[in-house]
Regions:
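Bacterial N-terminal signal peptides that target proteins for export
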Residues: 1-7
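OB-fold and OB-like single-stranded nucleic-acid-recognition modules
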Residues: 19-187
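Bacterial N-terminal signal peptides
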Residues: 9-15
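Sequence termini and other peripheral, non-core segments
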Residues: 3, 15-22
Length: 187
């Protein structure tokens, strides 16, 4: 019986290649734990919170940043968080980037760019690490935490601090301490 359990455990382990990697101490931050690797650190840049409409989410396992941020959220806020507008926004998330479009902008393009963003989500604790993966397109969530900078060996990953920037480096690197569902919508 003992050998059978060991064999089952061994087979389960062999079939979990990437899952095993994500449980190593290198992935502590992505699992909501404190960094223990000697070159890893998180620095708070400023507190951040708000209501955000989820336009999409993408889970990452294999990129360098997955050690810290296991999921990205495509979000809107303000006027663009209203369901009648948000349902018309289509998103494509890839390689930690976000492309979005809407057939008819209800505001000037410059203003619209300030109401949609890609957020790299870092869980502040193991409970949040589970909750952040439960969002669905259309959910309005209240997120509270900090915009941060991550350092790891040769990597410096720093959050944007302004909603007016676009392009590379314009995303929020958001360490989430709490998440509350304000409403669930199907958009």
């Amino acid at each position: 019986m003992k050998k059978q359990r060991l064999m089952i455990a061994l087979l389960a382990t062999l079939g979990m290649g990437s899952a095993l990697a994500s449980t190593s101490s290198e992935y502590n931050i992505a699992n909501g734990l404190l960094p223990v690797e000697k070159d890893q650190s998180i620095s708070v840049l400023k507190p951040f919170q708000g209501n955000f409409r989820i336009l999409g989410s993408k889970i990452y396992h294999n990129d360098e940043q997955a050690k810290f941020s296991p999921i990205d959220y495509a979000v809107s806020w303000g006027l663009f968080a209203q369901p009648e507008i948000a349902r018309h926004i289509s998103v494509k998330q890839y390689d930690r980037y976000l492309n979005w479009k809407i057939a008819k902008l209800p505001v000037p393009a410059e203003q619209a760019m300030q109401m949609v963003s890609n957020m790299h989500i870092i869980p502040a604790n193991p409970e949040i690490a589970q909750q952040i993966k439960q969002v669905k397109r259309g959910d309005l969530v209240y997120l509270k935490g900090d915009l941060v900078e991550i350092k790891d060996k040769d990597l410096v990953w720093k959050s944007s601090l302004t909603p007016t920037d676009t392009g590379d480096g314009a995303c929020e690197l958001f360490r989430v301490q709490s998440i509350h569902w304000v409403e669930k919508q199907n958009i």
